[in-house]
Amino acid sequence: MQPLHTLLALLPLCRSTTALLAFPGAEGFGANAVGGRGGDVYVVTNLEDSGEGSLRDAVSETDRIVVFAVGGVINIEDRLVVSKRVTILGQTAPGDGITVYGNGWSFSNADDAIVRYIRVRMGRGGDSGKDGITIAEGSNMIFDHVSVSWGRDETFSISGTAENITVQDSIIAQGLETHSCGGLMQTDGGVSLFRNLYIDNKTRNPKVKGVNEFTNNVVYNWGGGGGYIAGDSSGQSFGNYFISGPSTSVTAFTRGNENFHGYVENNYYDPDQDGTLNGNELGVSSSNYGGMDIVDTKYDYPAAQYIMTPDEAVSYVTENVGASLVRDGVDSNLIDQVLSYGTDGALISDEDDFGGVGDLDGGETPTDTDGDGIPDDVETQLGTDPNIADSTEIDSSTGYSWLEVWANSLVPEGYASTRKC
């Protein structure tokens, strides 16, 4: 068990605390998602597809905080449909954590979802024409350190009337051919994409329409479409790095038009596939950004607290993104591709072409006498009672429940925690 960080370290850094963050380090449009705070704790106790103690059962009801007493691969046949106000804390799983394999997830209308440190691997056996993760409606959601791969349609898509969504520190990878798309980000309700890795998707890395902020992302080895920009939009892009790979056939930004209004700053493109990170800044001109209408003034969107240089973003992303508390073989191989700087990478049509989902160490189930989701030894450190189910009580010094205090302590706060105000 990792030692608990001090409670002071869990406080949001350098920003107003009038609205509680989903967790320390949450940023962007979805930063204040509530999740299941105030609801019940559900402990996932097995790796079954359904039934009592399963993840499917855990997310089937509203107002729940989901933690894990097991680690490993959960094989699912049908899509997982997540209810409103659910927190999924994958970092609480023992061993190598949790991978959900075999089909995708729907977060449509899953208002206030908080999802952290989990792997969603759809695969060839998933529903044809469906995404790894879909959000078509709903508001106030944040996805942090999530690894999503092998979508049959898109890998991670946000569209329709969805609003106030953040995807941060995550991997969106290897949409399966013949479609092979990173995903749509098409909503006027606001999407923040901060410090993510898009890799081995032929197109839509991502496809943006509407209100969007795209900051410190790395896009690697796209095929015929890097950053798609289309339609009536107001977006901005800061400090991203596009790195061509063996499959890349077009420049970084494509398909823009005069209805796409964008503020751009310090975005880099490395086209030469020579094994060295040596790209250059894309000049601020419409021709470098797919024909978009370049604007001179930043939009007043909820920005990343710190904006890295593109080189810093590559270092951060390769070290930290995805379900990185324990990186599985899939994510490790993807990161190795990025670090080849153009010489390795491929578009795939079947996950078996990349070695499949692999195995995970399930770890040991911790003792939790009162069944409230917090192991007994941690309750002793926190000062709570291991014999009384008190994990949903609020710690007055942070505003989070004791369960959240513990879960937050298991993982780094993110890039902002390493910086000074």
From Swiss-Prot:
CC per GO annotation: extracellular region
Documented EC number(s): 4.2.2.2
Superkingdom per UniProt: Eukaryota
Keywords on record: Calcium, Carbohydrate metabolism, Cell wall biogenesis/degradation, Glycoprotein, Lyase, Metal-binding, Polysaccharide degradation, Secreted, Signal
Segments of skewed composition (Acidic residues): 367-376
Compartments, record wording: Secreted
Gene Ontology molecular function, alphabetical: metal ion binding; pectate lyase activity
The keyword Signal is assigned to this record: yes
Protein name, UniProt field: Probable pectate lyase C
Organism: Emericella nidulans (strain FGSC A4 / ATCC 38163 / CBS 112.46 / NRRL 194 / M139)
